[in-house]
């Protein structure tokens, strides 16, 4: 027999699958459907690394298995191709971004096809295609019409080098994640999406979906819903109130100072009264260099200034309390002001110690000698006037009643979640389909005029004042108002990369439809997505944004379900062989092209699934790759053992055990243990002189989702009918997964003396008869009387003698 040569085999089968559209999703909507989705990649210039195929292979395995179980499987792929890295590369190398994107996509697709994924390539999408982003723009217009898109001046993280705004997550230690430059705070007029209107539903509807618990927790924590009250503190010097949000209204008697954000409007409104205004403005300039994450870091030293000229009045004690400005209070959370209770909050305690501010404990048992007393969910109130002696819960309710009765506050639900900044001052993104008219204000384009196509420009760099390159194209900017026909100007900001990825799963259901996002018939049949797998790094922003868009589309009658994904799982990273994250700078990146060339795509697929627990990170090991290649070499050689007349019964129990374990493990993401079971079965095959065609056929079907090329090739060589992918998935008989013959331990007076082979259902007399024939057991029974026999069926047999 010729040697296993994956290079020729794999090209042959990939060509067959492509030419025959083997994995094209059927239009037959009478079949039960299975929609499997993996996050579509950003097509970078570096191409795929070995981390990419891990999730793709995982859901490819599930998809191939489900096809053999009779499902109509939708398993698509596309490209999340807008984004800053492409634009920066285009600027640096003087190449058009669309050319860069096209080349990168070609490379990514070539790599994916070389690994043998069963994607339906007829449904391929690209977020930079005008036929695609026409519908991204359409969704934005619907949001605008419903009041969910609005423009607002707000402070943002600004990178002077990249000349663009950055999300908090893109700022590392005060520097831009992309270029390393110093980030500053800058006020910009930005388009916002009102995701906060959906905050409660985004939390409450998680009960209806099957997500990993840690994914649900991340979503809930990111939204940060908290119940409390807004309370007004009067300002002594002027007719003004400072409003705070607090979850602990019961502790207000312990509020000994207030802190407002450096951006709080009161500072400039009363700048003429603030004696140290220059000092505060200088401090604000320093704070502008920090990200919000840095400003709220609990471990950093507390900084700030007392505002000389504004004093607050505690509405419960009527005492005057100082007002400070500090970086740890954010204008974008709550009201931009806090009442500080230093006896019971770590940050307030550190701040109060530094500025020598009074501390008043209000919970019984508080020891604040060395630190704040923060175990305050239980206990009774002290130093709190009419709340004294009440429990924490009783005191909260009493205080809510009091502030509403006295009209100094009210109960309120608050969220950490902020509205979504939706503008980017860059070129390579979807144009925002709005124009500004002096008479009509902001007006959306007519739907018949979509898509608003991104115009070609000679220079992709943002302007020095931070405007998009589109602002320099006069014939793009100047237009007519769609409403009144007068002169108007277009919005020149573009959408963020998140836009196209917030609804792409819907387009896969009907990717060539030019009348709608997708037909109602297709959306009703294919959605929601049955199983979505992606990285843990995307379980907050991307998952939250797409759930928000989906809920909006549900509200306007476009989609049939409240949630986009019924199941969400995540995978661990593949690390370098030194246990560090793969990166060019560390020199530990492994290119899948090299593995496919040297070992074969099936070896790569097998190793990626055998490397360890799918949900956990695992280091790459070339020895592990070689081990999987040896396994496939052994699979190849096992053809020689097949004899059509061999006895099937000899291996029947192990075969049924393997069908059961592999079937369950594939669905439970336990690919490593499924492959280990297949290795066990293969070893047992090789311990026999011959195996039956039926046994080997079952083995090939079970292995096919992991290693589709070698199994199809052997299948054809063995003369089995049709193709593996057309076969029915084998079913197991539960009764046949249990061994009829077992090894039973035999004890004499509680001590193990032997084991005997016995039928699992053997009676006590049958076991005894077999046991006494064992030479060792017989020796311990000589000249003894058997007084008792203890038989735990299928477990142990104990003979008591005297």
From Swiss-Prot:
ATP binds at residue 584. Gene3D superfamilies: 3.10.20.590, HUPs, Isoleucyl-tRNA Synthetase, Domain 1. Coiled coil: none annotated. One of its GO terms (cellular component) is cytosol. Its main location: cytoplasm. The keyword NAD does not apply. CDD domains: Anticodon_Ia_Leu_BEm, LeuRS_core. It catalyses: tRNA(Leu) + L-leucine + ATP = L-leucyl-tRNA(Leu) + AMP + diphosphate. A motif ('KMSKS' region) lies at residues 581-585. Disulfide bonds: none annotated. Keywords: Aminoacyl-tRNA synthetase, ATP-binding, Cytoplasm, Ligase, Nucleotide-binding, Protein biosynthesis. One of its GO terms (molecular function) is leucine-tRNA ligase activity. The keyword Disulfide bond does not apply. Pfam families: Anticodon_1 (PF08264), tRNA-synt_1 (PF00133), tRNA-synt_1_2 (PF13603). PROSITE patterns: AA_TRNA_LIGASE_I. Belongs to the class-I aminoacyl-tRNA synthetase family. This is Leucine--tRNA ligase. It comes from Finegoldia magna (strain ATCC 29328 / DSM 20472 / WAL 2508). The lineage of its organism: Bacteria, Bacillati, Bacillota, Tissierellia, Tissierellales.
């Amino acid at each position: 027999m010729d040697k296993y040569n994956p290079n020729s085999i794999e090209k042959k089968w990939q060509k067959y699958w492509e030419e025959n559209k083997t994995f094209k999703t059927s239009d037959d909507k009478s079949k039960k459907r299975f929609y499997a989705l993996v996050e579509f990649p950003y097509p970078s210039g570096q191409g795929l690394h070995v981390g990419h195929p891990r999730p793709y292979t995982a859901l490819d395995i599930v998809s191939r298995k489900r096809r053999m179980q009779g499902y109509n499987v939708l398993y698509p792929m596309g490209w999340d191709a807008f984004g800053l890295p492409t634009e920066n590369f285009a600027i640096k190398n003087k190449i058009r971004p669309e050319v860069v994107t096209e080349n990168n996509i070609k490379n990514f697709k070539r790599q994916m096809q070389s690994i043998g994924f069963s994607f339906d390539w007829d449904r391929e999408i690209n977020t930079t295609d005008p036929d695609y982003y026409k519908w991204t723009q359409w969704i934005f217009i619907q949001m605008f019409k419903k009041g969910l898109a609005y423009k607002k001046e707000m402070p943002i993280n600004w990178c002077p080098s990249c000349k663009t705004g950055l999300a908090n997550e893109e700022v590392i230690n005060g520097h831009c994640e992309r270029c390393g430059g110093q980030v500053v705070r800058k006020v910009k007029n930005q388009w916002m999406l009102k995701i906060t209107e959906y905050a409660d539903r985004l939390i409450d509807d998680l009960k209806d979906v099957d997500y990993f618990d840690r994914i649900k927790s991340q979503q809930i924590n990111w939204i940060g819903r908290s119940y409390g009250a807004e309370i007004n503190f009067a300002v002594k010097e002027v007719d003004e109130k400072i409003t705070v949000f607090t979850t602990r209204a019961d502790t207000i008697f312990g509020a000994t100072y207030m802190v407002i954000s450096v951006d709080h409007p009161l500072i400039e409104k009363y700048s003429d009264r603030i004696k140290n205004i220059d000092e505060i403005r200088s401090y604000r300039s320093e704070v502008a260099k920090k990200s919000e994450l840095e400003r709220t870091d609990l471990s950093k030293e507390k900084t700030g200034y007392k505002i000389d000229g504004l004093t607050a009045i505690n509405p419960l004690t009527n005492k005057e309390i100082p007002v400070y400005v500090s970086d740890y209070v954010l204008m974008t959370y709550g009201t931009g002001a806090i009442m500080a209770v230093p006896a019971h909050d770590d940050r307030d305690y550190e701040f109060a110690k530094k500025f020598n501010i009074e501390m008043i404990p209000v919970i019984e048992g508080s020891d604040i000698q060395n630190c704040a007393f923060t175990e305050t969910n239980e206990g009774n109130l002290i130093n709190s006037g009419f709340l004294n002696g009440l429990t924490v819960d009783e005191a909260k309710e009493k205080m809510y009643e009091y502030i509403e009765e006295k009209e100094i506050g009210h109960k309120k639900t608050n969220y950490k979640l902020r509205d979504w900044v939706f503008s980017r001052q860059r070129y390579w993104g979807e144009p925002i389909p709005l124009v500004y008219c002096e008479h009509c204000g902001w007006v959306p384009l007519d739907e018949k005029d979509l898509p608003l196509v991104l115009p070609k420009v000679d220079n992709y760099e943002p302007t020095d004042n931070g405007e998009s390159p589109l602002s320099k194209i006069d014939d793009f900017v100047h237009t007519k108002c769609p409403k009144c026909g007068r002169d108007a100007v277009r919005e020149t900001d573009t959408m963020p990369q998140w836009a196209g990825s917030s609804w792409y799963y819907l387009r896969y259901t009907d990717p060539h439809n030019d009348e709608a996002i997708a037909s109602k018939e297709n959306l009703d049949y294919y959605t929601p997505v049955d199983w979505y797998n992606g990285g843990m790094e995307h379980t907050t922003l991307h998952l939250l944004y797409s759930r928000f868009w989906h809920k909006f589309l549900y509200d306007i009658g476009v989609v049939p379900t409240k949630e986009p994904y019924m199941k969400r799982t995540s995978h661990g990273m593949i690390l370098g062989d030194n246990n560090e994250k793969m990166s060019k700078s560390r020199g530990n990146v492994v290119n899948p092209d090299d593995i496919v060339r040297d070992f074969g795509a099936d070896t790569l697929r097998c190793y990626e699934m055998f490397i360890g627990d799918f949900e956990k990170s695992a280091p790459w090991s070339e020895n592990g790759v070689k081990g999987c290649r040896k396994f496939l070499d052994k699979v190849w050689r096992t053809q020689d053992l097949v004899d059509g007349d061999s006895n099937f019964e000899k291996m029947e129990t192990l075969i049924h055990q393997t069908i059961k374990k592999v079937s369950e493990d594939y669905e439970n993401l336990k690919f490593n243990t499924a492959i280990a079971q297949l290795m066990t079965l293969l070893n047992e095959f090789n311990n026999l002189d011959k195996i039956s065609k039926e046994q080997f056929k079952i083995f090939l079907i079970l292995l096919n989702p992991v290693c589709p090329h070698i199994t199809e090739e052997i299948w054809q060589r063995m003369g089995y009918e049709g193709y593996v992918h057309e076969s029915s998935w084998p079913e197991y008989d539960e009764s046949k997964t249990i061994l009829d013959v077992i090894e039973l331990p035999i004890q004499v007076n509680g001590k193990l003396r032997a084991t005997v082979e016995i039928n699992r259902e053997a009676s006590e007399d049958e076991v005894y008869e077999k046991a006494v024939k064992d030479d060792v057991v017989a020796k311990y029974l000589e000249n003894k009387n058997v007084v008792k026999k203890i038989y735990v069926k299928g477990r142990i047999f104990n003979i008591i003698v005297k």
